[in-house]
Each structure stands twice: as C-alpha cells, then as structure tokens.
C-alpha cells in the first residue's frame, strides 16, 4: 500500500516545463515563406551533407568519451535516488545551509512525569537520575495545566494533595520543593528536600491520549482495523470526505489550514467530523459531529503552505471508546531524530493515477528526514520553512496523496503515540526524491494550547 500526498507544492517547488508544449509551433524571424529553386536546394543538400558528416565525426567522438566516463565512473551517471539510509548520495547536492543553525543556549528546565500506578507527580532536577516526589507547597492549578501541556496532554483533569502517611515510601525517597518566587519550569525554582513541610505531595491527572486499547489484537495488513489509530478523523463537506484530521480532545480536532482555505466559502453547517471510522461506505446521512468553529492559524500562507494547521471545535463532544480517542502532542522540547519510524494514515488516493479516495482507511510507515536534506537542491531546494518537516523515502515507495491532507503523522514514544506532523504538501504522489511535507506540530503547541484553553470540556 502506498499513500500519496495531497496538494501541489509551493510555487518554488513545482516542475518548470521548458520550451513550447506539444503541438505548439511558431515561426522565427527570417524564415523563408516562398519556394526555393531546385539548384539552390541541391547545393544546399551537398553543403548540408558535408556539415552532417563533420557533425557525425564529432558526435562519435563525444559518444566514445561518454562511454569511457561511464566505464571509469559508473556511479556518477546514476540518478539520485534511494532510501533515507542513502543520505550520503546527496553530498553533491547544493545544501540549503552548510550546517544546522545553532540554537541559543536555553535555561535548564526541570523534567516531570506522572507515576502511572498512583498518579503522583515526580520531578527530575539538575540531571540527577533519581525522580523526586513533588511537595504540595506552592502548588496551583495553573502550574498543573502547564505540566500537562509539557507532557503532551491538552488539559488538566484532576489534581490534589496526598498525605505522605497515605502512601508507601522507601527510606531513601527525596522530594522537590517549589520556590514561589520562580517559574515552575526553571531548574533553579526546585530544591531537593528530605521531606515536605506540608506533609503532602501532588497527585496529578491529565487528559488521556496516545493510547491504542485494541492495538494488541491487530495483526498485519495495510487496510486498517478499527482502533488501530483511534484519533484518526475524517473531515467531510456534506457527505464527501475532504481531508483527514486528528482528535486532540472530545471537542477539538486538528487538520490542515489549506483544507479549510480551499472551501472557505462553504457553509459552516455543511462540515462534519467522523471519528472511529474505518470504511466510508459505513457512513450514514446525518452521522458525524457538526463543526461549531473553524480556526485556521492566523499566519497561514496559501502561497507556500506555511503555518498549515487549523483547529476545528465540534458542537458536541465525541464519545471516547476503544476505537475513538485522542492523540498526544509532542512533549516540551521533545525531539524525534531523523530516521525515526513514524506512521501516516488516511483515505487518500492509493495510486497517482486515481481520481478517487480509498473507501478503507490506509496506513504506511515513513521515516523522518533531516530538514537539511529535504531543503537540498536534490529535493525541495529550500522550500521548507521552520514550521515544516519531511518524512518518506527518496525512492518514492510510500507517501500520502490527495485526500490525506490534514491527517496525522504519528511517532511512538514508548507506549504513547504523539502527533509529530499534519499532512500538508508534496510534489506529486510518491515521486522519487520528493518525500511528503508535513506541518511541524511542535512549532504550534503554544497556539494550540492558547486557542483550546478557554473552551475545553
């Protein structure tokens, strides 16, 4: 199975056709428009034969030289193609930048995690290997929400102080105490302690995301079984699947801004979102959640698909189940290295020549590209912005296509799945040297949090 990419690329990345198209002819200045005499024609033929003979000798010498080059340097004549692991073959390409830009040094931050057994919040300070229980002193719901966001969750669902006398502690357990004068994520704000003055530690729960309850029952195949990607959504205009989307919360779905921009004149009441769907043939009239608001990123550019994300707020909340659930966002400062095996899914065209979407949900694995390689002259020649990332293969074996736009690119983080990209654009579908381009979700976390914060359920 091959998924293939939706929209045409930015103008800078499109093919440029050279010369007149088929069947187009023109007369150049100086062309003769009247008949030529036979004598002139014969003399012209003799001169032409002599010229052709000389050109033939030169051409023969050129072919011989080229064959010698092929024999001595066979690799030089091969087209640039291959998988991500063949990155060294692009060394002759002109890179968009000689080296990756160095980021300014950021203040060291504290790391958090939530114990899955008792939901106690733990912190790691100053690169110490030990995880410390967080004292309840100085705690606030606002800090709890910030921590949930930093872990890739969209909302805070529960928090409280737990008495130390109610939990089992080993004798070596240490604690982290927050200084009320400093920010909650700066390392200097947290001090290791042997005990908590209040006698309480923090219990924290965030919205559930990134889990696949039915994953253990799925075996092989490229047509997707129910529950394999529970956050996959179908964004439909009327009864027609238009784009993919990803469920972030019961009333929030993220998709591509260009999907909404292409149909910006459509009535809001015509949009519906289907979740837990595998086959479109199973959809019945009036099914799906109506869209209450469409919120494209305010900086979206229709010219180069920069900032290509949009949020959809639903009129009614989705009912989460084994087949419907939310995907996690990337954690704070989380980095997925090039070569990471991620998955893209959707109902898009399964072949470049097809003009219809797939009835069954499809998926395929794609490795992440380095932005430097994707912006090289061999691939997209600098068309990518910092809000974009690449995933796929240089040999074009698998990709996304029309109808997949807005859908999820997810990467595993242990047992948790995180939304790393939103299907955005590419050159053609599964073309060699042109992998898929995705909106980089990590660049939009603040906007997603700020937009969804006031009206989450």
Curated annotation (Swiss-Prot):
It is an enzyme of class 3 (hydrolase). Glycans are attached at residues 163, 170, 195, 319, 375. It is found in: Cell membrane. It is a single-pass type II membrane protein. Residues 1-21 are annotated as: Disordered. CDD domains: Tryp_SPc. The record marks 217-218 as: Cleavage. It holds the Pfam family SRCR_2. Residues 1-49 are cytoplasmic. Residues 112-207 form the SRCR domain. SMART domains: Tryp_SPc. PROSITE patterns: SRCR_1 (PS00420), TRYPSIN_DOM (PS50240), TRYPSIN_HIS (PS00134), TRYPSIN_SER (PS00135). Gene3D superfamilies: Trypsin-like serine proteases (2.40.10.10). Residues 71-457 are extracellular. GO terms for biological process: proteolysis. Its EC number is 3.4.21.-. The chain crosses the membrane at residues 50-70. The keyword Lyase does not apply. Keywords: Cell membrane, Disulfide bond, Glycoprotein, Hydrolase, Membrane, Protease, Serine protease, Signal-anchor, Transmembrane, Transmembrane helix. Brain-specific. Predominantly expressed in neurons, in their axons, and at the synapses of motoneurons in the spinal cord. It is linked to Defects in TMPRSS5 may be a cause of deafness. Belongs to the peptidase S1 family. This is Transmembrane protease serine 5. It comes from Homo sapiens.
